[in-house]
C-alpha cells in the first residue's frame, strides 16, 4: 500500500484568479480504505500564501471530503497582484495521512482541524506523506497576462482547456478592457489569434474604445489576422459604437490587402463613419491612391458629401493639392461643380490653398474645351493665359483641338495649332483631330491640318484611317485633300471594321453635323467616330 487517500479529479488544484474576487480552488480527498477511517493533514510549505479548510480531519471508510485552498495574492502597491509563478505554481504542499482505527466519527465536521499533530509523527504510526498536490492558476488575470507575455502557447492552451466552460475564460478582458483577441492582435501574433479562435470566443466583443477585433486588425494592417477573423465569420461592418468600421481603417491606413479581403467578403464600400465620411474620403485625405483606385473599382461613389463640411472626395483632393488623386477622381466621373456647405467647388478650394496646378483639371480645361467647341478664340487665349494646359485632355482623351476640328471652328483650330497644340494627339479610341475633321466633313479644317503636318496615316485603335472614313462617306473633296497630302490608298478595297452598335462612353451625339453626316453615309459598313462631340467635359486631365 503506497497511499491511503486518492486525489480527485487529479492532483492539480485549479485556483481562479479574478480581480476583486477570492482566489479559491477545491480538491477532493477520497479514503481508499474499505474498513478503516483515515486521518489527514495538508500543509503548504509557504503558509502565508494559502489558507486550507479543513487543514486536517478524519475521513470515514470509502468516503470523500472536499478541501478548499485559498490563495492570498501579494498586496504590494503598484503590483498587479499576480502570483509569483503561473500558470503552474512553484509552491509545494504536503499531505500526511494515517490510519485511524477505532476513531469514532459521529459528525465528520466535528473532527475538522482537531486531529492531534502527534498522530502524524512517524514515531507512533506509519504515516504516508504525499507531495503530489500542485496548484494551477487560471482565470482572466492569468490568461490576459499570458497572452500579453506571449511566451508559451502551451500554457495558454492548457489554461483554456482546464477552465470551467461556465467561466467563459476565452472572453477574458484585462484591466484596460482588451479581450484576449485584442491583446493577441496588438502583439501581431496570428498564431495566438488562431489558438484563441479554437475556443470559440465572442468574435464581435468590443474593447474599451468600442472596437471589435476585426477593426483592430484592420487598423494595424494584420492581413493574416484579418483573414483568420473573416474565416470565423467576423462581421465586416464592425461595431455600431465605433467611429470607424474595418473598411475605413484599411482605407485610411493604406492596407490594400486587407481592403481587398473586406470587399471580397461584402463590406459596404460606401458605409459612413460617425462624421459622415466614406472610405473614399479617408483614402483621399491620406493620399492612399491605390486604395482609392480599388474603392472606385468596387463602385465607390464620388459624389458623397461628408457631414461636417459637406466636402466630396474631390474637395479633399483639391485641398491637399493632390493632382494625381484629382485626375483619378475626375476620370472615374467625379462632378467638379458640386458645392460644399460653404458654397465652394473643388476649384475654389484649390484656389484658396494656392494649388494652381489643379486649375486646368478643375475648371480651366472645361473652359478651354467649351471655347474651342464654340470657336471663341479670345476666350481660348484668356484661358491659356490664366494657366490652362493647351494639351489638356478630358477623361476620354479629348483635347480642345479635337473639339474645334469636329465642329469645324477654323479660327480656333488655327489659333491652337499656332500655340503649339499636339496635332496628332489621340483620344482613348485612337482618333486624332484629323479623323474628327474628316469624319464631320470639314474640308477647310482637314486641309489646314494636313498642311500643318498632321499624320495622314494615323489610325484608330481599330485600324481605321481618316481616308477610309471619308471614302466610306463619299466625301470626294476631302478624299482628294488626304490623297494629295500623302495618304495611302492601299487597303481601301478592304472592308473597314464595323462601327460600334451604340455610342461609346454614354456621350451625347449632337443633332447638327453628325446627323447630316449620317444622311450622307453609304450603305457600306464603316467605322465612324459618331459620338465625338459632347456639351460639357467631365474632366480634363
From Swiss-Prot:
- What phenotype has been reported when the gene encoding this protein is knocked out? Impaired arbuscular mycorrhiza (AM) fungi (e.g. Glomus versiforme and Gigaspora gigantea) passage across root epidermis and abolished arbuscule formation in root cortex during AM symbiosis, thus leading to aborted hyphopodia and no arbuscules. Reduced accumulation of PT4 in AM roots. Abnormal nitrogen-fixing rhizobial bacteria (e.g. Sinorhizobium meliloti) infection threads and fewer small white root nodules, but normal calcium spiking in root hairs in response to Nod factors.
Which InterPro entries does this one have? Ankyrin_rpt, Ankyrin_rpt-contain_sf, Ig-like_fold, MSP_dom, Multifunctional_ANK_Repeat, PapD-like_sf
**Domain of life (superkingdom):** Eukaryota
PROSITE patterns the record matches: ANK_REP_REGION, ANK_REPEAT, MSP
Q: Where is the MSP domain?
A: 4-138
Any idea what this protein is called? Protein VAPYRIN
Q: How does it assemble?
A: Interacts with EX70I at the periarbuscular membrane (PAM) around the arbuscule hyphal tips.
Gene name for this UniProt entry: VPY
Kindly name one Pfam family recorded for this protein: Motile_Sperm
Q: Which GO terms describe its biological process?
A: arbuscular mycorrhizal association; nodulation; response to molecule of bacterial origin; response to symbiotic bacterium; response to symbiotic fungus
Q: Where in the cell is it found?
A: Cytoplasm; Nucleus; Cell membrane
Major subcellular site = cytoplasm
In which ranges do the ANK repeats occur?
Answer: 176-205, 209-238, 242-271, 275-304, 309-338, 342-372, 374-392, 396-425, 429-458, 462-491
Q: Which organism is it from?
A: Medicago truncatula (Barrel medic)
Q: What is the topology of this protein in the membrane according to its UniProt annotation?
A: Peripheral membrane protein
Q: Which keywords label this protein?
A: ANK repeat, Cell membrane, Cytoplasm, Membrane, Nucleus, Repeat
Give the protein's biological function: Required for arbuscular mycorrhizal (AM) symbiosis with AM fungi (e.g. Glomus versiforme and Gigaspora gigantea) both during fungal passage across root epidermis and for arbuscule formation in cortical cells; this symbiosis promotes phosphorus (P) and copper (Cu) uptake. Essential for infection by symbiotic nitrogen-fixing rhizobial bacteria (e.g. Sinorhizobium meliloti) leading to the formation of root nodules.
